[in-house]
Amino acid sequence: MFNRVPSRARGRAGRAAPFRSGRRPCLAALLAGVMVAAAAAGHAAATGLPDQLVTATVRADAPGRSDRAPALRRALGIVLAKLSGNPALEADARMAALDPTPLVLDLSYEDVLIDKPLRDEQGTYDRPFLLTVRFAEAGLRELLAALGERTWTGPRPRVAPMLALRHRDGREAALTADDPLVDRARAALTAAGARYAVPIALPLRGADAAPAGAVAVAGRLDWVESEFGWRAAFELGGQSWGVSGASLDEAFRALVGGAALRLRPGGGAAPR
């Protein structure tokens, strides 16, 4: 059941369909207006949501470089996806022209190479940084409403991936909480859970059922040499999805993001 990826799911998961300006000619202006109006209210109001839901960390160049706006847009996309439970918002084309700056409450940079000395000016500019951004809750709510989405503020169910992996060397393994041979996959899954604010509960070795109280997502990941990546297929409550030619990080984002989309109130994608 899990050795084939549905044809509609091939390629990168979570990609939004291109925005067609002819369908909603005023949407870009509407979103821009929402950003400005929401920022005024958002900066004045204390957030009632956990910081985890309104904060994202992305890679960026040195502080002050011209790439800050794209980095802020990436961070905003992650937060919108996390707050709504719709992973498609990460790559929503409608966000491409927006400036997220008015919604930023605070931000900070972390030098990834902090223990390595600076060698020259060029090296300084080329050093990678992690940019952590916290956005205003009121502004996020307004923006999600303009995008046809709602905030997912209630308790989130624990997700228990019940997965088999076939590695590049042909070795088969189950993804469990206590097998040291799947440390890399487990770390990628943990990162995906944090990205979408979905708690993860892995089974122990030998378990044939999900941990108590968790929602099981069945599936498998197979390394496919011709695609130079992982082909993954998942199933939850009779609904299936997947991804192909993916890294482990991308495959587990597809798993957790797809589960969030199906488990959020109302389930499924919001109407466009």
State the predicted function of each range.
Residues A28-A38:
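Bacterial N-terminal signal peptides
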Residues D92-L163:
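Signal peptide-directed extracytoplasmic domains
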Residues T101-K116, P161-L163, R195-A233:
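A short, hydrophobic beta-strand-centered structural micro-motif
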